[in-house]
Amino acid sequence: MTRREVLTLVPALGLAGCGYSLAGRGSFLPAYMQTIGIPIFGNTTPYQTVELLFTEKVRIEFQSRGQYTVIPVDTGVDGVVRGTISGISAAPVGFTDAQLARRFRFSIVVGVAFEDVKQQKRLWENPALNFADEYELASPSSIGLDASAFLGQERAAMDRMSSDFARTVVSAIMEAF
């Protein structure tokens, strides 16, 4: 074997045994954990139906991992994810020359926990996950805020945040961080 082959082979062998894996794809969950219940999250804010979007995104993210059956109830399951949306805010962060709001920061606070039903013990919890996204109005009018533009961009920001939230929560649960 040449020196070049040895220098190539040694690092490759070292990496083979290092336990490297993609972040967000590990699982510390017990082998018996096959069915995950994810009932609709609570919502203590005046924003109606936002809990449906966030709950659905968490369900989809768990299902995308491929090894769990996800159901919308907390009975007859091995583990359960519960959450409560406790705060939502939208605030202007950018303005036009006429001092009209052009860019908004939308944020949401969600408390979420994962419980092992069989062992009756909480495996992971974060009482105040905070997610934020900024969005710009496509064309603010010269007389003020265009409500339809605002609501359309708000929905898009909410959709992005709910996807980020779901990935973060499921990865944290799977890896117990």
Enumerate the language-model features and the residues they cover:
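Short coil/turn motifs at beta-sheet boundaries
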Residues: L29-A31, G76, Q99-R105, R160, ...
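Individual transmembrane alpha-helices with interfacial aromatic-anchor signatures
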Residues: F150-S162
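Short beta-edge strand/loop motif at the mouth of beta-sheet-based domains
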Residues: D74-G83
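Intrinsically disordered, low-complexity segments enriched in polar/charged residues with Gly/Pro
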Residues: L15, T55, Q99-R102, A147, ...
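Surface-exposed short loop/turn segments
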Residues: R65-Y68, R82-Q153
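Short capping/connector residues at structural and topological boundaries
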Residues: S27, M33-Q34, I38, T75, ...
